[in-house]
Amino acid sequence: MIKVAIATNINFYKSTLPIVISSLIEQGIERDNIHVFNAGFDSYDYQVIDGIHYHRLDHNSYEYSPLIEIVDKQLESEYWFLVHDTCKFGPNFKKLLYNIPEGAIKLSLNNKPAMTMGTYKYDYLLSVKEKIMSIRNTDYSEESMNHWKIWGVPNEDYIMWMTEPRPLIYNDDARWEVADNDNWFGTNTQRRTEYYFSLDLYKNKSNWGQSPILKRTI
């Protein structure tokens, strides 16, 4: 079984979740296998709404927040697929997602850097729990959030590529291309859409090395 862990946060979820969730459902992902991890709140809360699991988190470590919550709360699934809230999916996504070689521990979206996105075996996540929990952040000050955003640049794929064993690349396909320069969310932030062949996945990005200042806007 694969459960989908969507990484979002208190500032962006109202704009991003309608797009990513509707795309997952359209491509045949069962509602009960979708978990939303919404970071940056003062207290924890959990609800099931329209069959989808919503975790309101009392911490914010960007895209690592779902992994932190999974190992901390011991949310079981054979595999967890971690995806950003700024993604959409094509018609082959589910078939490609479920194409997991026997014995696979980690499958990355593509070569490093892969934005931490990919599928992790639950038992493996528990085995590196201490490393995951070491980056749990509860300080929401501007200084702290900027610190962790900057920390994430050299430490991208902290668990996927920077922690043994090395992952497989999904469907042995590391190809990607820039699809367009659209902003899906109707804001003035400069964004571009990248397409990843390995999972028939589209990612709408605001940071791709085009600026020395990392954006924290939608």
Annotated model-derived regions:
Residues 1-218:
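ER/Golgi luminal nucleotide-sugar-dependent glycosyltransferases, focusing on the catalytic module
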